[in-house]
A protein has these predicted regions:
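Extracytoplasmic/secreted cell-surface and envelope-processing proteins
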Residues: 96-100, 126-130, 153, 162, ...
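Core catalytic region of metal-dependent phosphoesterases/phosphodiesterases
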Residues: 70-141, 145-146, 215-218
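Sec-dependent bacterial lipoprotein signal peptides
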Residues: 1-18
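Beta-strand-turn-beta hairpins that frame and shape the catalytic cleft
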Residues: 49-58, 143-153, 180-182, 186
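Hydrophobic/aromatic beta-strand patches that form the interior of the parallel beta-sheet core
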Residues: 59, 88, 117-119, 152, ...
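N-terminal active-site segment of His-dependent metallophosphoesterases
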Residues: 20-104
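His/acidic metal-ligating clusters that form di-metal
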Residues: 79-86, 161-220
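Active-site metal-binding loops of divalent metal-dependent hydrolases
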Residues: 62-65, 91-93, 122-123, 156-157, ...
């Protein structure tokens, strides 16, 4: 009888161990396979490639969530051009903030011949989406210089955050004004949710626009 119990325990243990690699993790688990920290790496490539250029040309795409076939066609179209220095994705890579959605879009965008950077969209903030976005792509507010143009990329998805978080982050905007590169003569403010959109906190729209216009004075 004791032997039978022992055999049962051992058999169960062996079954459990052999079945471990078949465990399916929760869609919002946040375990990431593949490349991470993409924006930082690609920004370094962009700044190096564009350093001596007076003019930069970049592709802008957005809201590719759930459309992998369309994203693949966009990638193919951009790759067919020789005059695009980099691609700027304005967010909504995911529909529901699922880890797999970000991985699928990343893997598709990785086929671009030239560097790309991604901003966070309102759908990307759902569930554990913000965490996954930060791991795969990087900070939700960031800036870089391509040639003589400064790109200030902002999280403006106010409705996805509570009032303990400043969205847009005016501290970041002020900091960027203070460290504005001397060589930059142009500014591109990139965001997913523009002022007047339903995702933007329109109570602060006038102040936000005023702060963005301050970049023009810095560049003048």
């Amino acid at each position: 009888m004791r032997f039978e119990k022992l055999f049962t325990v051992v058999s169960f243990s062996i079954f459990f161990l052999t079945a471990c690699n078949k465990i399916e993790y929760h869609p919002y688990d946040g375990r990431i396979n593949g490349k991470t920290g993409i924006n930082k790496k690609n920004i370094a490539l962009i700044e190096k490639a564009c350093a001596a250029k007076d003019t930069v040309r970049f592709a802008v795409i957005s809201d590719t969530q759930g459309w992998l076939d369309e994203t693949a066609r966009i990638v193919k179209s951009i790759n067919s051009r020789q005059d695009v220095d980099f691609t700027l994705h304005l967010g909504d890579l995911s529909d529901f903030g699922l880890t797999k959605e970000f991985e699928w879009q990343r893997d598709c965008l990785e086929k671009l011949a030239r560097p790309y950077v991604c901003l966070i969209g309102n759908h990307d903030c759902l569930a554990t989406g913000e965490y996954v976005f930060k791991k795969i792509f990087g900070d939700i507010n960031f800036a870089f210089t391509a040639g003589k143009t400064r790109f200030v990329c902002l999280n403006t998805n106010s409705r996805e955050f509570d009032h303990t978080t400043s969205v847009p982050d005016f501290s970041f905007i002020k900091e960027q004004q203070e460290i504005f590169p001397a060589e930059a003569v142009n500014t591109v403010a990139a965001m997913h949710a523009p002022p007047t959109s339903e995702q933007f906190d329109n109570n602060i729209s006038p102040y936000f626009e005023y702060e963005l216009l301050s970049f023009l004075k810095r560049a003048a």
